[in-house]
Amino acid sequence: MRYPPSRLRALGAVGCVAALAALAACSSGGSSGSSSNSNSGTITVAVVSNPLITGQMIPLTTSSFEKQYPGIKVKFATYTEGDLRAAIEKNVSTHSNAFNVIMIGPYETPLFAKNGWLTDLSKQYIASDPGYDAGDLLPPIAKALSYKGDLYAAPFYGESSMMFYNKTLFKAAGLTMPTNPTWDQVQGFAAKLNQPGKVAGICLRGLAGWGDNMAALDTVVNTFGGQWFDMNWKPQLTSPAFTEATNFYVNLIRKYGEPGAANDSFNQLLTLYGQGKCAMWYDATVAATSIATTYPDVYKTTGYALAPVNKTKSSGWLWSWALGIPQGVSNSGAAWKYVSWATSKQYDQLVGQKYGWSAVPPGTRTSLYSNPDYQSAAKPFADITLQSINSTDPEHPTLNAVPYVGVQYVDVPQFESLGLTVGQQIAGAIAGTESVSQALQAGQSAASQYTPAQLSGG
């Protein structure tokens, strides 16, 4: 089920005539792209810096894509997650055309598409390119990257969130991790496994950002029954459920988490876990791929469990790093060639052959999860990753009805700023420079500056 268009908010006013004109200028059929220079030219691709990008996509672009398409030169602009979002929004909102391809996710894609900032991949390219096989994309991921039924960003990888744990440490302590643990159970495990100065009982995101500490915290808030706004768009950050969940998360880190947690997000925690310094780690399912390829010894001792819950049946987030083409960019045909290559079944084959099948970007295609080579190589985490993704429900992320879509975000343009602001306050609470109560009061005040009409798009 695709998110209702009425619930997707615009980031700002963009002239419909200009957007339609740009669309018409780009349109034509064929998988080779829409422009006369579809087989040549230089394209710049803005991407997030993480192992699947820097360790696979970028080198394979040089060794494979540019050899297959010698007339196309690919340049990369690599950013941290927060910097990437700022650079891309500036690029698309001002139509600077600095990037021919942009890496975005389910939060940005429908909002950008509604504003006319993205090329409709379904109509522009996929409709005349049956070899791309968009029907093979995992439904939750494809729906999250669509607007009014059309795909506007092609998924490079998809993810939910889950718990990673060190089986050796659990066995030594006489502990057993359930497949579907509760947060209370996790807290008990962390208390028993914590070895200050040596091994953290649990590692969690603390770095400020709506896609950093707030991504993990939001899943806790949801399963505790909290929400960002009620059905009248009144902020709920100081509600009992939101407060209880935040206190739980912050206290869990401060008591049993890694030192300096307020500076840590995915990349830092991957390193800590790979070094054996985390008894448990709650984060993106895609981390399983990075652990398998980067830390093979730790991979052998790693167990996996679903995202912990409290009052809900499931709580994992839903995300994808995907590739979109800004509306009206030059060399759009070459851009599509790159997007279709990097998100294809053939790319999966290429990665599997070169890096091993456990290294293939997960969470995008149904065919990957029926591939015997992948199932064999990624057996420990393949099925639980797929289960985690399929159990997400961005339209109903918490116990009560909400006026927004999103598990770890709220699908309004104001959330990018609001999520960062609240994330900064939570990072302060984790660092001990303010209390959780102070952090949430500040967050409530920040959310209250927006009127219901602004948030609802009315």
Language-model features: where?
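Glycine-centered hinge/linker elements that transmit conformational signals in sensory
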Residues: F189-K192, N232-N263, G303, A307
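Hinge/lid segment of periplasmic solute-binding proteins
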Residues: P106-S160, N213-A216, G303-P308, L386-N390
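Short helix-initiation/N-cap motifs at beta->coil->alpha
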Residues: T78-I88, Y107, P181-G188, G260-G274
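Conserved N-terminal structural module of periplasmic/extracytoplasmic solute-binding proteins
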Residues: R2-W117, A127-D133, A262, K311, ...
